[in-house]
Amino acid sequence: MADIKNYTLNFGPQHPAAHGVLRLVLELDGEVIQRADPHIGLLHRATEKLAEQKTWIQSVPYMDRLDYVSMMVNEHAYVMAIERLLGLEVPLRAQYIRVMFDEITRIMNHLMWIGSHALDVGAMAVFLYAFREREDLFDMYEAVSGARMHAAYYRPGGVYRDLPDTMPQYKASKVRNEKALAALNQTRSGSLLDFIEDFTNRFPKYVDEYETLLTDNRIWKQRLVGIGVVSPERALNKGFSGAMLRGSGIEWDVRKKQPYEVYDRIDFDIPVGVNGDCYDRYLVRVEEMRQSNRIIRQCIEWLRKNPGPVITDNHKVAPPSRVDMKTNMEELIHHFKLFTEGMHVPEGEAYAAVEHPKGEFGIYAISDGANKPYRLKIRAPGFVHLAALDEMAKGHMIADAVTIIGTQDIVFGEIDR
């Protein structure tokens, strides 16, 4: 009788658990994975090359579209790289607003992760709960920028505008009765800070709900404990960062170890795993949501007490106010030059890294003194994590590959760029 050889299976790119456009070529022995070969590039949009044809400020919206679940954090790394090249001082209020929205974005990302990860494993309820909370976070984005996803809110030298004093209200429609409308607008009667504070009061209870459903759930633990184990040494050698590295027991967080903006003024803890498996990475991310909530509350407290400018007054970098522009010819010229020719960034190179929800997201920008980047290199954390999929999945069942992809928190916008 002929020997039964390993067979090859295509997983994705149109698989519901492939997190976008991942194509995995799996070499199987029965149902056991011998080799996993990720094929990338199906969402490649040449972002790095496009940035070379655009002025420095025109590339901000492209950053939103890299990891399209963590929009503002991508922008943050990019504007920080420009600020380092310019040697620009950012107003303190703008720094606090950035930190607050970074953490709002982190919660937004982790809600998407916990919902889709649980859905992949077979728990549908968490996905629906997570999207209930994300709706409030999208409303926060919409209040400051007018856009629910691709905000383009951060600017070199600060942020686009200050936090609004009123929240947008839901309007009556054919699909909403008076009772539903009143419930939706109940928390929207005050300012944006009031709305965010109300959310931070409610959010810990929501995280408790997710933990009640998952943390001690027998099926959840059977599917995650001991799956995709990565030792601290291998995690470092593979270039892991973020929750993937902390889940393996290494206490590394860019916000603590290389503080940027005002993270050195804020009190928070770094959750760290022990076993380096999918379950530990789950626990780390859940605790990260609680810590982000804590950071947001500290930012709200500071922002309430300290009004001030939210963008630099250097009009070669940031536009003048509309009032000044309409009354002063010089300001009008600044505005015209900035949005036609763009700003000229001094010759040099800079690397800016932020603690992205998925790991260390870095922008390496090289300027030749022109109004466009000479070269822009994007360091995507998910790219490194996906490269380790073969090692993490070897010897596991095919169903465990879904769990491992979920625990890596893969989004292809940043991997394919």
Curated annotation (Swiss-Prot):
Species for this entry: Ralstonia pickettii (strain 12J)
Matches recorded under InterPro entries: NADH_Q_OxRdtase_suD, NADH_UbQ_OxRdtase_49kDa_CS, NDH1_su_D/H, NiFe-Hase_large
Entry protein name: NADH-quinone oxidoreductase subunit D
NCBIfam families: NuoD (TIGR01962), PRK06075.1 (NF004739)
Molecular function via GO: NAD binding; NADH:ubiquinone reductase (non-electrogenic) activity; quinone binding
Family named by the database record: Belongs to the complex I 49 kDa subunit family.
Gene name as annotated: nuoD
Assembly and oligomerization: NDH-1 is composed of 14 different subunits. Subunits NuoB, C, D, E, F, and G constitute the peripheral sector of the complex.
Keywords, sorted A to Z: Cell inner membrane, Cell membrane, Membrane, NAD, Quinone, Translocase, Transport, Ubiquinone
Reaction(s) the record says it catalyses: a quinone + NADH + 5 H(+)(in) = a quinol + NAD(+) + 4 H(+)(out)
Membrane topology: Peripheral membrane protein
GO CC terms in record: plasma membrane
